[in-house]
Amino acid sequence: MTTPSTKLNSGYDMPLVGFGLWKVNNETCADQIYHAIKAGYRLFDGACDYGNEVEAGKGVARAIQEGIVKREDLFIVSKLWNSFHDGDRVEPICRKQLADWGLDYFDLFIVHFPIALKYVDPAVRYPPGWLSENNKLEFSNASIQETWTAMESLVDKKLARSIGVSNFSAQLLMDLLRYARIRPATLQIEHHPYLTQERLVTYAQKEGIAVTAYSSFGPLSFVELDLKDAHETPKLFDHDVIKGIAQKHGKTPAQVLLRWATQRNIAVIPKSNDPTRLAQNLDVTGWDLETSEIEVISSLNRNLRFNDPLAPSRLDPIPDD
């Protein structure tokens, strides 16, 4: 099973459904990627910060070696971490990440957060996380413009076919578009019925910037991180509105949540290690929700953001070995 694509402003096609690598276990990552490719997934969304790019690359290499896919059939995404925003750090870390994946280019390389942190040498700690080599939260003076200029050079050097941003506000996008020589192809944001960000989505799409949703299942992604809000918020899978719509269409709650996004041309990047769920998550484009159903799902919005980049737990000192 394959899924439709959306045309990026860079001219490339990006699948509307992909496989996200956040929190994918290193021990199982290669096998998960391999089996996802066999199931029909073509977009894989990784990042330096996830710490599993070497293993992900092994899964890709196995699938290519066995003739299941060719490199050009895949759409591989990775992200620039906060510690590498200085202009002279962008290309070296991109090349390292490409080497980890075993690739010559990324289909899409994204600025992970609009937050520039002090450089951490990969030889000292990789992924670097949020703290400096001094075990503190320390910022770099790199501006987004400096970082973006370096990102554009990745396209010039054919290290990335498209470049994009993540966790940007509309205001930051407006600023970026004033000076960008190469416009961001995508905006990746937390997007689920408890955090719809409708005005941001509308603005990005109006500017020709494709939107990708992460954490499509809302609090579920964050319960294991022991976030208070995630524990206290009703699970979307159990919500009467979602369950009722799922029953009506003969789909699972997960499929309804994903279709709520893809029907509005928003890409999604769920993950699963279960073959049945892998197939179900791909089956979110060939059927439609009614307009009234999309509206009632959107009405669940609470402006509730779970991915807080400055949450206290992320800023705890790293314990000594």
Swiss-Prot record:
Pathway: Carbohydrate metabolism; D-xylose degradation
Its EC number(s): 1.1.1.307
Binding residues annotated for NAD(+), in chain numbering: 166-167, 215-224, 271-281
GO molecular-function term, one example from the UniProt record: D-xylose reductase (NADPH) activity
Active-site residues per Swiss-Prot or TrEMBL entry: 50
Catalysed conversion reaction: xylitol + NAD(+) = D-xylose + NADH + H(+); xylitol + NADP(+) = D-xylose + NADPH + H(+)
CDD domains per UniProt: AKR_AKR2D1
Site feature (Lowers pKa of active site Tyr) residues: 79
GO BP annotations, alphabetical order: D-xylose catabolic process
Pfam families: Aldo_ket_red (PF00248)
Chain sites annotated for binding substrate: 112
Keywords: Carbohydrate metabolism, NAD, NADP, Oxidoreductase, Xylose metabolism
Domain of life: Eukaryota
Family: Belongs to the aldo/keto reductase family.
PANTHER family: ALDO/KETO REDUCTASE
The name this protein goes by in its record: Probable NAD(P)H-dependent D-xylose reductase xyl1
Provenance organism: Neosartorya fischeri (strain ATCC 1020 / DSM 3700 / CBS 544.65 / FGSC A1164 / JCM 1740 / NRRL 181 / WB 181)
